[in-house]
Amino acid sequence: MRKSLLALSLLAATSAPVLAADYSDGDIHKNDYKWMQFNLMGAFDELPGESSHDYLEMEFGGRSGIFDLYGYVDVFNLASDKGSDKVGDPKIFMKFAPRMSIDGLTGKDLSFGPVQELYVATLFEWDGTDYKTNPFSVNNQKVGIGSDVMVPWFGKVGVNLYGTYQGNQKDWNGFQISTNWFKPFYFFENGSFISYQGYIDYQFGMKEKYSSASNGGAMFNGIYWHSDRFAVGYGLKGYKDVYGIKDSDALKSTGFGHYVAVTYKF
């Protein structure tokens, strides 16, 4: 049976008590689901560099057996506007974040306290350009430990800690902690709802030879209206020395950016 992100989010928001993952019965596919959506995005004062532009995002995720997946593909400057801040920049950016359930792999319930499930977590980031022709090419692989944690009011929050391997430099460069959440908090009679959704990506322990700041990150705070097929939202994103770039007059990397989105769900 097809389960949408909407259904899972509502379940997470309304179920009491919330049970830990239990695969001791051998049925690793009982929690399977999948979802996909397209987001037409507008970004304003995005950091670093205070860029304003449009882009189309294909966003997807799901669960199949012991594997959990989230990812997206962004395509920038859809109309190829010569006045866009993205002119001359890579056209595409991709992020894939597969996780493998340790609970599902071992068939054991490894939950403790608010931690519901443990994962081997990975994250891959690419912009599709060649490092030989673009010194700022993105080619990062990250691996570490992941978890689903029950947090008061928020419900289930994904928490992952990675070590960062920079593929272009062929070297490890610090760590990243990432969290994400989706919390419906106001419901309408027609079944639509308003959610608070977002994430934190914070990098630390970065090497001086690759970064002008040893730590930095970003936090996205989105307020979205959702129906079964559509969503409309606004996001405020806060930055602090993002990507390890020290904030300066020459390149602003600390501050706030704004995002608007219109979504169609498949």
UniProtKB/Swiss-Prot annotation:
Highest taxon, organism lineage: Bacteria
Subcellular location: Cell outer membrane
GO CC annotations on file: cell outer membrane
GO molecular function: nucleoside transmembrane transporter activity
InterPro entries, per database record: Channel_Tsx, Channel_Tsx-like, Channel_Tsx-like_sf
Listed Gene3D superfamilies: Nucleoside-specific channel-forming protein, Tsx-like
Signal peptide: 1-20
Transmembrane spans: none
Keywords linked to the UniProt accession: Cell outer membrane, Membrane, Signal
Broad class of the protein's primary localization: membrane
Role according to the record: Serves as receptor for a broad-host-range vibriophage, KVP40.
Family note: Belongs to the nucleoside-specific channel-forming outer membrane porin (Tsx) (TC 1.B.10) family.
Name of the molecule in the record: Outer membrane protein OmpK
